[in-house]
From Swiss-Prot:
It is found in: Cytoplasm. Catalyzes the 2'-O-methylation at nucleotide C2498 in 23S rRNA. This is Ribosomal RNA large subunit methyltransferase M. Disulfide bonds: none annotated. It comes from Pseudomonas syringae pv. tomato (strain ATCC BAA-871 / DC3000).
Amino acid sequence: MNTLFMHCRPGFEGEVCSEIADLAARLDVSGYAKARPDTACAEFICTEADGAERLMNGQRFDTLIFPRQWARGLFLDLPETDRISVILAQLSTFPTCGSLWLEVVDTNDGKELSNFCKKFEAPLRKALTQAGKLVDDPRKPRLLLTFKSGREVFLGLAEADNSAMWPMGIPRLKFPREAPSRSTLKLEEAWHHFIPRDQWDERLSGDMTGVDLGAAPGGWTYQLVRRGMLVTAIDNGPMAESLMDTGLVQHLMADGFTYKPRHPVDWMVCDIVEKPARNAALLETWLGEGLCREAVVNLKLPMKQRYAEVRRLLDRIEEGFQARGVRVSIGCKQLYHDREEVTCHLRRLDVAKAARK
């Protein structure tokens, strides 16, 4: 099991390779990354048998930026018939697993395999259970089978608490009909990724205040309003009437890069299409000056050297807060609903909850 297999957004295979090679260098795991363009996956081949396991044990999955899912294991060729027997034979060296996910890569070819996986899962699950290879126990490793075709599968293992929370890392979020734009799903997914669900009532409560920079027509404002927050929407464009009718939104025609609230707020969110360095500077200003407690900001990516640019910006942000003596937690992820961008979440660790004005 010396291969680490990772899912990603199509077109970002190179970024996954760069990021995982960085990780391997830090953890002193020898090997090499490889991927083909637009295949929505990448691999890191370790030269030592325990290399993939050391990579996974040495890194929290939710702190990786570009991989959507990961698993350590091996590729297996399958016959046209009796695939289950071949899989069971190969799994003889695997530990007993506590859950089973069948996955495909996020390409058109991968999506065509979804129906096959749905039909194949029940008999496979039954066979694994009868063979003693699958029990219902979240403390045990998760068995991840990624089908590249009906004749090739990656047999992988991952800890349930150190891998994606959804199969393939793709959330099952429903677009709310009353939301003014589909961008609303980006912020909802960000909350799922960066904030533990049992902390939502505390950190996304109805007595909070928020600012949405570049808000129009209100996709991200909608998420704040849905949690009951009072929101100041900053944009020279029009906001959706449905949001203004809630009485929870104040719309100010102003520049999102120069606006500052008179009183600190709990949340600042921003999805302005601008150079990433400029949006990153907003994070430094708002968190560093105590204008907000938490923030979600999207950084649009350049065409080339995307991982290097993200890493450079994150390092600069971190150094800026260290220079100010401000304690923050910093998270960054290319979410499923992101396109040529990544989403950053920052939280001040030394500021009390803002008073609602």
